[in-house]
Amino acid sequence: MIIIPDIHGRTFWKEPVSKALETGESIIFLGDYVDPYEYEGIPKGGLVPMLERIIGIKREHPGQVTLLLGNHDLHYLDENLGGSRYDYSRAVFYVRLFRDNSELFQMAAEAEIGGQKFLFTHAGVKRGWLDFEDDYLGKLAPEDVCSRLNEMWLDKEQRPALLDILADISTSRWGAQPYGSPVWNDIEDMADDADELPDYYQIFGHSQQEENPVIGEHFACLDCRRAFRINDKGSIQEL
């Protein structure tokens, strides 16, 4: 399985995705496709075509490619999820692409590789957040988290409630809630390396690292501008 962490307009994903499409290896994008960092000097003119291409890849290979959503994607659908670097000049295009192709995206994914269960989200899942928002989510066992988040996303009647609780931001990200959501949770909130969801190893991005990924006992934060692979034994390797 190939893992593509936060893109933000970068091109590092293209070669590993192209190779994986040829070999049939599964691919998962962890979200945050747009809103590049100004200091990286990424031309914004190519971002809409890039997002269109990624969506096209998903349409062409629906069973092979998984597209997760991050906070920089969702804030084009709900202003309460607003974050930095919102691109007002291209917002109308992003809104259309995310809204009109919403069924191609999801909030979470899971897989079992090498005897290990993996849960993929944009920013990680805290047990405390699941309990904090159980009025909306219901009482969830670890094995129900992925399906419940995706159910709420794909059901247009439940989606507004999901977007409301996804706007939860903890103090680690200058928010006011006791827990961050799976698109806003900060790596500091996971820093104790607690086993938040027993039996699941969590993989996420969102918290950009200067150089190397953070790979712990119970989670891996891979937001470091490179692609990764989970091999058949369940080990994470940089590509």
Predicted regions and their residues:
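Catalytic core of PPM/PP2C metal-dependent serine/threonine phosphatase domains
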Residues: 98-114
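Active-site environment of divalent metal-dependent phosphoester hydrolases
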Residues: 9-13, 35-37, 72-78, 126-128, ...
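Active-site neighborhood of phospho(di)ester-bond hydrolases with catalytic His/Asp-centered motifs
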Residues: 4-5, 27-31, 66-71, 120-121, ...
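Beta-strand-turn-beta hairpins that frame and shape the catalytic cleft
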Residues: 1-2, 110-119, 216-217
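Conserved beta-sheet core of the metallophosphoesterase superfamily
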Residues: 183-239
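Active-site-proximal loop/helix segment associated with metal-binding centers of metalloenzymes
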Residues: 112-194
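Short coil/turn segments at beta-strand junctions that form active-site/ligand-binding loops
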Residues: 23-25, 63-64, 105, 115-117, ...
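Core catalytic region of metal-dependent phosphoesterases/phosphodiesterases
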Residues: 4, 9-100
